[in-house]
């Protein structure tokens, strides 16, 4: 049973699908359980647990009655996907090769915790991702 998993609402579904379909198996051992780049929905699991779902933002906006509102506004990030990985540098390069955009390069952060290393990037739709190891 999935107690809680992330569902990203994306405007650039096909690009995001290709990005996550390329990086989630290597970063998290996730397997795609449904969906195609045609959308409007796709999901990846590790074992029986949901890891990530993508849903077309416009399709959900039509369901919940917000289609007339702007999809994007200039604000600071409100959420971040975080993935613990064995090698932050390799994970960062993997994500960049598949369409991720750098936000902050791999950096050791001892002030955050012993052995902590992080990198920050954005998926093709602009969602913030942190890769971390410790």
Residue ranges and their predicted role:
Residues 1-5, 76-80:
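Short, solvent-exposed beta-strand edge segments and adjacent coil->beta transition regions
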Residues 9-59:
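Core segments of cupin and vicinal oxygen chelate
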Residues 12-14, 78-124:
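Vicinal oxygen chelate
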Residues 43-48, 121-124, 134:
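Active-site beta-strand termini and strand-to-loop segments that position acidic
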Residues 47-49, 74-78:
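Short connector loops at helix/strand junctions that flank enzyme active sites
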Residues 57, 113-114, 120, 131-134:
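Short beta->alpha transition motifs characteristic of CBS
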Residues 66-71:
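Short, P/G- and charge-enriched loop/turn segments at secondary-structure junctions
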């Amino acid at each position: 049973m999935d107690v809680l998993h992330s569902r990203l609402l994306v405007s650039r579904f096909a690009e995001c699908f290709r990005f996550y379909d390329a990086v989630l198996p290597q970063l998290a051992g996730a397997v795609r359980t449904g969906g195609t780049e045609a959308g409007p929905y796709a999901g990846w699991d590790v074992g029986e647990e949901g890891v990530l779902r993508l849903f077309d933002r416009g399709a959900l906006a039509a369901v919940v009655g917000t289609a007339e509102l702007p999809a994007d506004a200039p604000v600071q990030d409100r959420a971040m996907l975080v993935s613990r990985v064995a090698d932050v540098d390799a994970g960062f390069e993997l994500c960049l090769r598949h369409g991720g955009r750098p936000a902050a390069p791999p950096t050791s952060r001892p002030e955050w915790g012993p052995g902590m290393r992080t990198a920050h990037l954005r998926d093709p739709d602009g969602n913030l991702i942190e890769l971390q190891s410790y």
